[in-house]
Amino acid sequence: QQICCGYLESDEGRLQVLDNNRITELMNVVEENSGKAIIWCNYVYGIQEIIKNLTAVYGADSVAAYYGATKQEDRQDIVKRFEDPDSPLRFFVGHPKTGGYGITLNEASTVIYYSNSYDLESRLQSEDRAHRIGQKKSVTYVDLIAPDTIDEKIVEALRNKINLADQVLNEETKNWLR
């Protein structure tokens, strides 16, 4: 999946940047959507590239990173600024394991998955950041998927997990009602 995101990390920890158009596709999606956006990415290098590209086009005040390297004392301020409709902070770029739990980001009208993981709980929790009490607008969800790659397999696995959960829960509900 790192290759689909435009780089490969060697066993020694060196990054090799690869040609890819995922960042271009992200910028196209961002340009097509007005309003605030949450962008989830599972890789630090990807988060840094997203920040760099968004900052170049929209300015430093419009972008905030929220992942493991983000200082604890800065995290609450980032959320507060993102939730302020008058704040210039338009893009919340984060790792779903860091920002996907326990925070409210319902000013977002778009949620973009730059990369996904097989972790359904993390996916559902990160989706719920934009759907909280107080959300008044509809939210658009976008998965950036390179055709014929691991991206498709991951999203298919997530859908299968949701379908399985629905079947199990529905069966349990039916049994409980008897």
Model feature map: region roles:
Residues 118-178:
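A conserved SF2-helicase RecA2
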